[in-house]
Regions:
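N-terminal signal-anchor transmembrane alpha helix
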Residues: 5-31
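Functional transmembrane core segments of multi-pass inner-membrane proteins
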Residues: 10, 126-127, 131-240, 245, ...
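Alpha-helical transmembrane segments of multipass membrane proteins
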Residues: 17-22, 109, 113, 141, ...
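Membrane-water interface at transmembrane helix exits
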Residues: 22-26, 30, 95-96, 117, ...
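Membrane-proximal soluble regions of multi-pass membrane proteins
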Residues: 27-101, 262
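Select subsegments of transmembrane alpha-helices in polytopic membrane proteins
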Residues: 99-107, 157
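Juxtamembrane "helix exit" motif at the C-terminal ends of alpha-helical transmembrane segments
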Residues: 111-125, 171-174
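Interfacial loop-to-transmembrane junctions
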Residues: 214, 247-272
Length: 290
């Protein structure tokens, strides 16, 4: 009963932080558009007009707003998931559809928090809770990266660097608290998760893989911290990608040169591998003998 109660609390925290992450993703996009405009680069003018009100010069005006009508949102509009359900996915003030972006982020992070708690690989006691808290912070950064990549096909440096720093804190804490990190295995994990894509990026000059995926691989390599889980994470990312892409190519909904957001695949594959990667690796080794 206590375990279920704590899992529910983790889910609630996931909903709240998922709501926060969704709001920050829109603000990051707005800042990127402003930066592109100032630098004289091409940018989506319609999107710039819609998102620029999110960046107010005065702190008291920097509040969440409806992206359709610009109305400043009140407390009852910001309750994770409940506000969206109560208005049936529409703005309370202009009745325009809000979409599924925010509730999906909230639900995804809530599910990730709950699953992480329920199948956490080490006994949660004492400093283990600190390690778990840092893990949850890394998931917030990761869900923001996933959402940004899905929506705009780019992994911003601010988010990849932030995720990498949190991952570094996590692996250092894991080294001292759990004491299961081998430095040589960690180095190989970094080569697998980032180095492989770095080589592909250089060979293709950015046509096959984006530099953002290479940078994301650094953070994921630190989180996984072993060559076995890194190998499985990369394997799962490509396997999931094939499952999603091949039907699209067969039905001609996707073309050979279609741009695919690979960041979410890396994130999902790594999340699964963090918890069950060692078991999957054992299965792969056993299967290779038959």
């Amino acid at each position: 009963m206590i375990v279920i109660s704590i899992a529910i609390v983790c889910g609630v925290f996931g909903l709240v932080l998922g709501s926060f992450a969704g709001a920050q993703v829109w603000r990051l996009r707005a800042r990127q558009l402003v930066a592109d405009k100032k630098a004289g680069e091409s940018y989506d003018k319609a999107e710039y007009k819609k998102l620029s009100p999110l960046l107010k010069s005065k702190r008291q005006q920097d509040r969440s707003r409806c992206l359709g009508c610009g109305h400043q949102l009140g407390l009852r509009d910001l309750i994770p998931l409940i506000s969206w359900l109560s208005t049936r996915g529409r703005c309370r003030y202009c009745s325009k559809r809000i979409g599924y972006f925010e509730p999906l982020m909230e639900l995804s992070l809530a599910a990730a928090f709950m699953v992480s708690f329920l199948i956490w690989p080490w006994h949660l006691a004492g400093l283990q809770w600190v390690l778990f808290a840092v893990w949850c912070v890394s998931l917030v950064a990761l869900i923001m990266l996933v959402a940004y990549d899905i929506k705009w096909r780019i992994l911003p440096d601010f988010l990849t660097v932030s995720y990498g720093l949190v991952s570094l804190v996590f692996v250092v804490l894991r080294y001292f608290i759990v004491n299961d990190v081998k430095l040589y295995s960690l180095a190989i994990a970094l080569v697998i998760m980032s180095g492989v894509y770095g080589v592909l990026y250089l060979i293709s000059k950015g046509k096959w893989i984006g530099l953002g995926d290479v940078k994301l691989g650094v953070g994921l390599g630190l989180i996984l911290a072993s060559w076995q889980t890194a190998f499985v994470g990369l394997f799962l990312a490509n396997l999931i990608g094939c499952v999603l892409v091949i039907p699209g190519l067969a039905s001609k909904k996707l073309k050979a040169n279609s741009e695919i957001a690979f960041g979410p695949l890396l994130a999902l594959g790594s999340f699964i591998s963090f918890f069950v990667g060692a078991r999957i690796m054992d299965w792969l080794v056993i299967a290779s003998f038959f």
